[in-house]
């Protein structure tokens, strides 16, 4: 795709998002359906209670519609596009049920952990079936060991990657605008990689996601008019992992997704430390809440985390593209 043509997928998803998001916000306000804030979160987040949620429903629709018509236009409606959208939808449905339970029963807990995990693993397995059907390379370089070509090892790795990063993005979604901005950076980086590698089909998926996220950010920046909900964050995290795998740059997520990795690591360290020593490492986890407790504003945290994400992406592009 030429540079001018790359703008079309982004504009399409952006336009659909900004066109329908205000209508959805209005509908959710009319129905008086809003986010239930976790009791263990920062006390000042209570003022966000009642803010419309499930905004992911609109930008997921924008991504799907734009990816399909652009794929048809560019003759790039490949299996890679379909499996990316499949994971987006399936993980989105898991999040939808989670969000729906929270709204209906007015509590901040939806699906049980094992139910969500089972759905995520099922999605990863279906993705793998399509992946192997297409004959994609399943050789994976592993530090110290070297190249591992065993199919069973790659299967386990992909399941961990999809489940891990969908949950990591979900954990990161705790501040206004944070995930919308960070995923724009992440998918933007993969768009550069896809263009470099000649993967126009994956490039289209990245471009429409960038457009949708920029559109959503207009309503999600502080003070947020709407949240994406688990519906949005689980879907984005799952598809982000799929894109990295389709480009056969699996390990790139450790740098390009450094914020998601850090957020998840902070939770693991916090829980582990408390169980082992009875002491907490951070004032609150995930780590973005730690900085809130230190007195940082949401904008300061957003901008700092986005900068770190940009640096991580820049390092990957500079040394590994």
From Swiss-Prot:
Cell compartments where the protein resides: Cell membrane
Molecular function per GO: metal ion binding; phospho-N-acetylmuramoyl-pentapeptide-transferase activity
Involved pathway(s): Cell wall biogenesis; peptidoglycan biosynthesis
InterPro entries: Glycosyl_transferase_4, PNAcMuramoyl-5peptid_Trfase, PNAcMuramoyl-5peptid_Trfase_CS
Keyword Cytoplasm attached: no
Keyword Magnesium: yes
Listed EC numbers: 2.7.8.13
Broad class of enzyme this protein falls into: transferase
Catalytic activity: UDP-N-acetyl-alpha-D-muramoyl-L-alanyl-gamma-D-glutamyl-L-lysyl-D-alanyl-D-alanine + di-trans,octa-cis-undecaprenyl phosphate = Mur2Ac(oyl-L-Ala-gamma-D-Glu-L-Lys-D-Ala-D-Ala)-di-trans,octa-cis-undecaprenyl diphosphate + UMP
Cofactor(s) this protein cannot do without: Mg(2+)
CC per GO annotation: plasma membrane
Keywords, alphabetical: Cell cycle, Cell division, Cell membrane, Cell shape, Cell wall biogenesis/degradation, Magnesium, Membrane, Metal-binding, Peptidoglycan synthesis, Transferase, Transmembrane, Transmembrane helix
Membrane-crossing segments per the record: 6-26, 53-73, 77-97, 121-141, 144-164, 175-195, 200-220, 226-246, 251-271, 301-321
Topology versus the membrane: Multi-pass membrane protein
Any one GO BP annotation for this protein: cell division
Purpose of the protein: Catalyzes the initial step of the lipid cycle reactions in the biosynthesis of the cell wall peptidoglycan: transfers peptidoglycan precursor phospho-MurNAc-pentapeptide from UDP-MurNAc-pentapeptide onto the lipid carrier undecaprenyl phosphate, yielding undecaprenyl-pyrophosphoryl-MurNAc-pentapeptide, known as lipid I.
PANTHER family recorded: PHOSPHO-N-ACETYLMURAMOYL-PENTAPEPTIDE-TRANSFERASE, PHOSPHO-N-ACETYLMURAMOYL-PENTAPEPTIDE-TRANSFERASE HOMOLOG
Protein family: Belongs to the glycosyltransferase 4 family. MraY subfamily.
Name of the protein this chain belongs to: Phospho-N-acetylmuramoyl-pentapeptide-transferase
Native organism: Lacticaseibacillus paracasei (strain ATCC 334 / BCRC 17002 / CCUG 31169 / CIP 107868 / KCTC 3260 / NRRL B-441) (Lactobacillus paracasei)
């Amino acid at each position: 795709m030429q540079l001018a043509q790359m703008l079309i997928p982004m504009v399409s998803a952006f336009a659909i998002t900004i066109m329908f998001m205000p209508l959805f916000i209005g509908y959710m306000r009319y129905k008086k359906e809003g986010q239930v804030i976790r009791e263990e979160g920062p006390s000042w987040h209570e003022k966000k209670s009642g803010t419309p949620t499930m905004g992911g429903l609109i930008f997921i629709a924008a991504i799907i519609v734009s990816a399909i018509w652009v794929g048809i236009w560019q003759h790039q409606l490949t299996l890679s596009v379909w499996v990316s959208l499949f994971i987006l939808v399936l993980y989105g449905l898991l999040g939808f049920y989670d969000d729906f339970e929270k709204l209906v029963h007015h509590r901040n807990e939806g699906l049980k952990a094992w139910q969500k995990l089972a759905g995520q693993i099922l999605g990863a397995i279906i993705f793998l079936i399509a992946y192997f059907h297409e004959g994609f390379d399943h050789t994976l370089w592993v530090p110290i060991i070297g190249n591992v070509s065993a199919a069973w090892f790659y299967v386990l790795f992909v399941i961990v990657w999809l489940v891990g990063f969908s949950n990591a993005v979900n954990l990161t979604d705790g501040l206004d605008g944070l995930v919308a901005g960070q995923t724009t950076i992440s998918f933007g980086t993969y768009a550069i990689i896809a263009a470099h590698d000649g993967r126009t089909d994956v490039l289209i998926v990245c471009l429409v996601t960038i457009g949708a996220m920029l559109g959503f950010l207009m309503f999600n920046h502080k003070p947020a008019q709407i949240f994406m909900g688990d519906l949005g964050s689980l879907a984005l995290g799952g598809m982000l992992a799929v894109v990295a795998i389709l480009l056969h740059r699996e390990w790139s997520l450790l740098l390009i997704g450094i914020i998601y990795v850090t957020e998840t690591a902070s939770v693991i360290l916090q829980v582990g430390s408390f169980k082992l020593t009875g002491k907490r490492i951070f004032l609150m986890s995930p780590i973005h809440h730690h900085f809130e407790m230190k007195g940082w504003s949401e904008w300061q945290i957003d901008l700092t985390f986005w900068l770190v994400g940009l640096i991580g992406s820049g390092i990957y592009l500079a040394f590994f593209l």
